[in-house]
């Protein structure tokens, strides 16, 4: 069984046991989160249910494995011949989750 869920403005195709890095969720480590925005639920050799826009009553349960930050991205601006340089770094926060159950 698989599902397509929306979290953090992005869509992910998930199956039970998958480990994902998603945009930061406000949840503690080792807690469970429910992803309610399910766009599609499919089973092997059975009919696929597509939501309009969401599948009613479908939920995906996941366990939070870790909270962290991604690698640093360096943003460097400069203007030639004008002695203007600006260096800035950014580390995007993420949540590592493991899909436990898909309820359709």
UniProtKB/Swiss-Prot annotation:
Superkingdom as given in the UniProt entry: Bacteria
GO terms for biological process, alphabetical: translation
Entry annotated with the keyword rRNA-binding: yes
A family per Pfam: Ribosomal_L21p
InterPro entries, per the entry: bL21-like, bL21-like_sf, Ribosomal_bL21, Ribosomal_bL21_CS
Record's keyword terms, sorted: Ribonucleoprotein, Ribosomal protein, RNA-binding, rRNA-binding
GO molecular function, one term: rRNA binding
CC terms in the record's Gene Ontology section: cytoplasm; ribonucleoprotein complex; ribosome
Family: Belongs to the bacterial ribosomal protein bL21 family.
Subunit structure: Part of the 50S ribosomal subunit. Contacts protein L20.
Function: This protein binds to 23S rRNA in the presence of protein L20.
Protein name: Large ribosomal subunit protein bL21
Taxonomic source organism: Clostridium botulinum (strain Kyoto / Type A2)
Upper lineage: Bacteria, Bacillati, Bacillota, Clostridia, Eubacteriales
Gene from which the chain derives: rplU
